[in-house]
Amino acid sequence: SLHDALPIFVEDESLTVLVTTTYMEEAELCQKVIVMHNGEILSQGTPEELSLKAKDKCFVIKPPIGINPRILQARLLDDSHNIIDAIPEGGEVRFIISSPEAFKNIKKIYSSVQIDKIDSRLEDGFMILLNEYKNKNEYSENKIYISNLYNEFEKSNTLEISNNPKKSKEIDIEVVNLVRKFGDFTAVSNTSFQVYSGEIFGLLGPNGAGKTTTFRMLCGLLPSTSGFLRS
């Protein structure tokens, strides 16, 4: 799978891989995570560092006999003063409290059921950050913006970004009349493009346009039917 291949590229080829995802379990596989919402960077660090933002705030509760976990989840989420998030998991409901006092309140409400403390994970840290973001009425002047992150990368010796990559004349990726067929179905049809050194490039298109198939061929995970590619 791609998840198995990426660490190999990083280790064997000394590559830096930038992954964008909405799935926290995928982000947990990365060495560094940048958490974003509405185009704004909320925080950044290792998955372990971000998970610690929810330390001592994560619990699981067993629903009373005859109560569906989804119903218990809904009840918890209605208590927005005490609960930041709640999700069904393995027949129980995992939830995040807003404060130590909130846990005392929850214990009183659900005194007849079992509640256990659990370790926090990246998704929990994200929910804490998102809750803080939503509760802010005024934004700090010290807030981190995408432009700040770009400036950090631009100054770094590990990543050189040219204002006009095409001036370098060095082509890192080249695709000419690339075709990939699955039986009678054409997934990629005569696609051509070039990516110059230092250029940030992406493919946009609806589902089924051939984006993933194209990148799989570029990564050597899938042979092309015809055409030329070099990466």
Regions found by a protein language model. Give the residues of each.
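ABC ATPase "signature
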Residues: 44-45
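Walker A (P-loop) phosphate-binding loop of ABC-type ATPase nucleotide-binding domains
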Residues: 206-210
